[in-house]
Amino acid sequence: MHLRTLHFLILIGIFIGGQTLGCMKKVCGNNAKNDFRRCPDTDGSCGNYHTERTSGEIIDGVDVRCHLGEPIYAPIEGEMYFWRPYGGKREKSCADQGVRIEGTGQWQGYAVHISSVKLSFFGGHVEAGDEIGEALNRYCFNDRGQNDVEPHVEIRLYKEGRLIDPTHHLQNCMCTGQICESNTRNVLLGDPFKTDKRYNGVRGWDVECQMIDDDDEDSPRAPMIYSPIAGEIVGRIRLFTDSNGAYTGCDNDGIFIVGIDDWLGFEARLYNVKARADIGFGRKRIIQGEPIATRLACENSPDSVFVEIRFEGRVVNITDIITAANCKTPNFPVF
């Protein structure tokens, strides 16, 4: 089998089992949607971000519903460490166990704290979705009625050392995911949501997309491009015509995808890319994150792809969703 074909098949496998940039895997047992405990709960407390807990303290974290003994999974990839959420207090020792995961790869710069958890092992690298332990009773040290509160584990998410709201990284997560194979975090070139004269002045994001040097290849190869949205129609974009009205030029290529499901009403346009020959154009089912194209490798091709997003036909700014800063579903008016 040709090495580049083999590489593509590996990419397909990664895509099938992969994780969307900015979206966490499930944390507990059968709680596939990472549902939070009731708000208000039986004692009036709440498990949402920046709300009052049973102790009366305002917590910048969330309580994911989870019964005693249910398996706990790593929501992100990273390096795992044992952590004591109650700082070694003897009277709370039965619940003073947790985990800290320092993010790597797509989650570089993030850290997740989960408590209370009895760990199956106490360190090392974990992939998102790996089983790491089981849930403990967070109120085992207190017999004053908290047993009526929905059982849960507490999640705190840090970015560059600062607590942030993990809600839309855990629930209803709607980030685009990684767009270019050689850019795991959708690093942008220049300002976000900018106008680019190279593509007839369209407005969007210039996503870095370097050629890839494989050890088993003599020359760099063009990186794969992943669909930022789920779609059902794929079409071709040709920006320029010659004096005879013909579309010519190696770098005169791009694609558009018409959204479905959570992306209904959206359209993604990608410039400086060439659709995979085996996909072609027309009506077909495209899964978000599916490898659908390669970056162009023409003589003057930039080391980037340009992404334009429209909603109901109008160009919209979804910078936070592209960069995974916030994966909340945008609330655009329907025109």
From Swiss-Prot:
Top-level taxonomic group: Eukaryota
Glycosylation, residue list: N317
Disulphide-bonded residues: C28-C66, C39-C46
Tissue: Expressed in body wall muscle cells, along the boundary of the lateral hypodermis, seam cells, processes of the nervous system including commissures, sensory dendrites in the head, and lateral nerve tracts, and motor neurons and some mechanosensory neurons such as ALM.
Example GO molecular function: metal ion binding
InterPro entries per the UniProt record, alphabetical: Dup_hybrid_motif, LECT2, Peptidase_M23
Binding annotation for Zn(2+): D63
Alphabetic keyword roster: Basement membrane, Cell junction, Cell projection, Disulfide bond, Extracellular matrix, Glycoprotein, Metal-binding, Neurogenesis, Secreted, Signal, Zinc
Gene Ontology CC: anchoring junction; basement membrane; cell surface; extracellular region; perikaryon; sensory dendrite
Signal peptide annotation: 1-20
Pfam families membership: Peptidase_M23
Record note on what altering G259E does: In wy935; defective formation of the somatosensory dendritic arbor of PVD sensory neurons
PANTHER family: LEUKOCYTE CELL-DERIVED CHEMOTAXIN 2 (PTHR11329), LEUKOCYTE CELL-DERIVED CHEMOTAXIN-2 (PTHR11329:SF0)
Role summary: Muscle-derived dendritic guidance cue, which is required for the formation of somatosensory dendritic arbors which extend from PVD and FLP sensory neurons during development. Ligand of a multi-protein dma-1 receptor-ligand complex, which is activated upon binding of lect-2, mnr-1 and sax-7 ligands to control the growth of dendrites that extend anteriorly from the PVD neuronal cell body. Enhances the binding of the mnr-1 and sax-7 ligands to the dma-1 receptor-ligand complex.
Subunit relationships: Component of a multi-protein dma-1 receptor-ligand complex, which is activated upon binding of lect-2, mnr-1 and sax-7 ligands to promote the morphogenesis of dendrites which extend from the PVD neuronal body. Within the complex interacts with sax-7; the interaction is required for lect-2 dendritic localization and enhances the binding of the mnr-1 and sax-7 ligands to the dma-1 receptor-ligand complex.
Family to which this protein belongs: Belongs to the LECT2/MIM-1 family.
Protein name: Leukocyte cell-derived chemotaxin-2 homolog
Source organism of this protein record: Caenorhabditis elegans
